[in-house]
UniProtKB/Swiss-Prot annotation:
Name of the coding gene: rnc
Provenance organism: Acinetobacter baylyi (strain ATCC 33305 / BD413 / ADP1)
Family matches, as SMART domains: DSRM (SM00358), RIBOc (SM00535)
Assigned EC number: 3.1.26.3
Main function: Digests double-stranded RNA. Involved in the processing of primary rRNA transcript to yield the immediate precursors to the large and small rRNAs (23S and 16S). Processes some mRNAs, and tRNAs when they are encoded in the rRNA operon. Processes pre-crRNA and tracrRNA of type II CRISPR loci if present in the organism.
Subunit details: Homodimer.
Protein name: Ribonuclease 3
Keyword Glycoprotein applies: no
Catalytic activity: Endonucleolytic cleavage to 5'-phosphomonoester
Subcellular location(s) of the protein: Cytoplasm
Length: 230
């Protein structure tokens, strides 16, 4: 039997997800980090959700891009299911306030750690499928989460990571390359949370956060690109 809390910490979570659970304990399990319990946590649901997400996104890309080859479709899928993309969806769903973490994990900033947020999104996908046993319903829910991002995915240059795109943008205009500075590291390896500032001549300082220095730099670069596109 799954051990659960009596109610969700955020009663509006199901509305944001777009699904009302028949077995609320499945959603609670999907929100429970292994730091709380080695037996009752989201890892099995995450395993299932990871496979389901890959299939849903692969099917969408196959239908939406009938003339793209396998290599480009694979790279597009990787862009949409990587940790950075799932972290953005977690933020859209406001999952950080709903995570069930140990006191130690909470103090180390686990509720903002991109890897945990991404894992939780996959676990929720698995939980919805187990609860509903309806793949078509799950597909519609997941693609609705992805609406803000599907329109911006391109088979070509958008597949490059934000740091590469920013560097190419500046080089093409003969401007100085960006400088990345780590300003804060929380927690202990391997569960660290990094804050990195990206400095570009003529633009305000922009901060990015992530579960690794690389992810934090990519997040900061993505924010700089948004400023340049305005």
């Amino acid at each position: 039997m799954i051990k659960t809390q009596s109610k969700l910490s955020d009663p509006r979570l199901q509305s944001r997800i777009g699904y009302e659970f028949k077995q609320l304990e499945l959603l609670q399990l999907a929100l429970t980090h292994r730091s709380v319990s080695h037996k009752y946590n989201y890892e099995r649901l995450e395993f299932l959700g990871d496979s389901l997400l890959g299939m849903i996104i692969a099917n969408y890309l196959y239908q939406a891009y009938p003339h793209e080859n396998e290599g480009r479709l694979t790279r597009m899928r990787a862009t949409l299911v990587r940790q950075e993309a799932l972290g953005k969806i977690a933020n859209d769903l406001k999952l950080s306030r709903c995570l069930i973490l140990s006191t130690g994990e909470l103090k180390s900033g686990g509720h903002h750690r991109e890897s945990i947020l991404a894992d939780t999104v996959e676990a929720i996908i698995g939980a919805i499928y187990v609860d509903s046993n309806d793949l078509n319903l799950l597909k519609n829910i997941v693609l609705k989460w992805y609406i803000p991002y599907l329109d911006h995915i391109e088979p070509t240059d958008q597949l490059k990571d934000p740091k590469s795109r920013l560097q190419e943008y500046l080089q093409a205009r003969k401007k100085p390359l960006p400088v990345y500075e780590v300003v804060d590291i929380q927690g202990d390896a391997p569960n660290q949370h990094f804050k990195v500032v990206c400095l570009v001549e003529g633009l305000p300082r922009v901060m990015g956060e992530g579960s690794s220095r690389r992810f934090a730099e990519q997040t900061a670069a993505a924010e700089i690109l948004k400023l340049l596109e305005q």
